[in-house]
Amino acid sequence: MTEPETTCKGFEVNHLVKQYANADKPVLDDISFKVEHGSVLVVLGPSGSGKSTLLRTIAGLEPIQGGTISINDQVIDAGKPGTERAGRSDRSSELRTRIGMVFQSYDLFPNKTVLGNITMAPVLVQKRDKSEVEAEAIRLLGRVGLADRKDSWPHELSGGQRQRVAICRALILHPEVLLLDEITAALDPEMVREVLDVVLELAKSGQTMLIVTHEMQFARAIADHIILLDLSLIHISEPTRH
């Protein structure tokens, strides 16, 4: 019996070029790779190799000057020469929410509670029902071990707790692809373990993820595939997640 073809084919970058104004050469030049649906791709590389820039262009926070970014064979961004000085891509808000991103710096709103931080975007941007969004937010907080902190303020949380809230804030938008940029870089070993446990659970649940990290142990624990970004993308290995 033939298996039915899935409608979720993955995420793909083809011949991506990113260059900043007045730069002698692109920071990303002819970059191509694919992340299969439900898998985890980890990007390693030295400082200044363009890892964070790669994630920012994929998230639509910066325009690309060449190539394409696609989800499930649908192009969501295409390179436009002459956009080196532009602040963001011209991707629509609907397309933006198909990709979620969590930064190293958390970026939580200090004047909103944990619950308020998580529910703001789906209510204001996606126009979803507030009560339903709040119920989902509470469920997400339970998944990351923070069900009792929904009314807390960001300054009352540890770094690991704030990072878990940031992950919930991205997940509640139902992204098809989740980008994680050095999310353990500023955390102590105990907090790294807290965040790694959450990411491992996401991987087991089938969340497609693209992760930038400098920690090889973290990479090997979570990755289906690892690539190195330096002057080019080099396939390293296909570790067994454990």
Which residues make up each language-model segment?
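The feature captures the beta-strand-to-loop junction immediately N-terminal to the Walker
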Residues: L44-P46
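Helix-to-loop junction immediately C-terminal to a conserved catalytic motif
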Residues: A59
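ABC ATPase NBD coupling module
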Residues: I76-G100, K130
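Conserved ABC ATPase signature
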Residues: W153-L157, Q161
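A short, proline-enriched helix->beta-strand linker immediately N-terminal to the Walker B motif
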Residues: I172-E176
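Catalytic Walker B motif of ABC-type/P-loop ATPase nucleotide-binding domains
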Residues: L178-D181
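H-loop/switch region of ABC-family ATPase nucleotide-binding domains
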Residues: T213-H214
